[in-house]
């Protein structure tokens, strides 16, 4: 089923253009109706939050108006993280939650992300149902009046409740750890001081002064250079970086080396496995995780399961087969025993607890994962699906895989949003990986119509 408005993580686009207040109003009406029609309450309850982007309040007001127009009781959380909304929906037993954010994307973008009453992101089927209402020739949704209209109130206590929940996910005092924490000028910025003071970490805040225009700007999990520099200059034990809506976490060791989501999953998974808490001794990853992580997991008696790219698919696999740890190289990491989606601050606390209790440095803990050099080439093609089924391209991939003899891998997949074929290779050396990916890319350009 092809969706027009919803991507892999909600409705997203350039604010006030692709994602206009008018569209936000309609998404509020349609989404609110679909998610609350079976509610037993006279007025179904929906929590609404946003990140720190300048367009957030504009879109929030439009979305809330749409929710009110179908009779919903709206609780505005203010600026709270995406995983904070997911947690509070369950804690407050609300019918749904909405987060207005474009996550790690640049400031001109924004998005609308729904959560069901169970705290999980919506299924493709529910998103399709909402889209059918958005594209209907006539608006057939209810138009209540008088006491049938929705109401709105602020619920700022939600942030405190979420902070308290996070603190309870670890059992170790973090006293003695010196940590630089980059808030990406995003939704975690107002949480960092209270949270990390309460767990007794010696922390140095970085990029925690949002002004509406600086969210993710040369900071946070996608731009860690400032964090790497600050960790070394302050002689900190490690650094932590979040993204704009707080659902990602990456780390930096005491020498300024990046510790990505793969390594964090390995470190936390190994600790959970040692304590008998890693269900089925398995970590769920996407196909983009590095071969070095799989080898490290295997060498320590752990298993892995791969899904397609997108944290929602990781969560689906975890729920389907009873796993409790999974995530992406980008830093979306799901601890399903605690929350229903990737949670940056939760991940940071779990990682810091492992560092503290192990008595080892982050660099030592991450050393088991020897990252294989990786190279990605994008090829523009006319037909992505036909390209994947091209026999000459399949033969070229098979030849390279034969050369690799298990010590490397090739991943060829279509882009989800652009007319591109993505060719990725991993191998023990940069020279080998470049040779492998070039060999396949050359064949793709020769045999695929319109390839360049």
UniProtKB/Swiss-Prot annotation:
Annotated InterPro entries: A-D-PHexomutase_a/b/a-I (IPR005844), A-D-PHexomutase_a/b/a-I/II/III (IPR016055), A-D-PHexomutase_a/b/a-II (IPR005845), A-D-PHexomutase_a/b/a-III (IPR005846), A-D-PHexomutase_C (IPR005843), A-D-PHexomutase_C_sf (IPR036900), A-D-PHexomutase_CS (IPR016066), Alpha-D-phosphohexomutase_SF (IPR005841)
Matching Pfam families: PGM_PMM_I, PGM_PMM_II, PGM_PMM_III, PGM_PMM_IV
Enzyme class: isomerase
GO BP field: carbohydrate metabolic process; peptidoglycan biosynthetic process; UDP-N-acetylglucosamine biosynthetic process
Catalytic residues (positions): 103 (phosphoserine intermediate)
Annotated positions binding Mg(2+): 103, 243, 245, 247
Modified how: Activated by phosphorylation.
Domain of life the protein comes from: Bacteria
GO cellular component term of the entry, any: cytosol
Keyword Flavoprotein belongs to the record: no
Catalytic activity from the UniProt record: alpha-D-glucosamine 1-phosphate = D-glucosamine 6-phosphate
Cofactor binding: number and manner: Binds 1 Mg(2+) ion per subunit.
Classification via PANTHER family: PHOSPHOGLUCOMUTASE (ALPHA-D-GLUCOSE-1,6-BISPHOSPHATE-DEPENDENT), PHOSPHOHEXOSE MUTASE
Alphabetized NCBIfam families for the sequence: glmM, PRK10887.1
Name of this protein: Phosphoglucosamine mutase
Source species of the chain: Limosilactobacillus fermentum (strain NBRC 3956 / LMG 18251) (Lactobacillus fermentum)
Gene: glmM
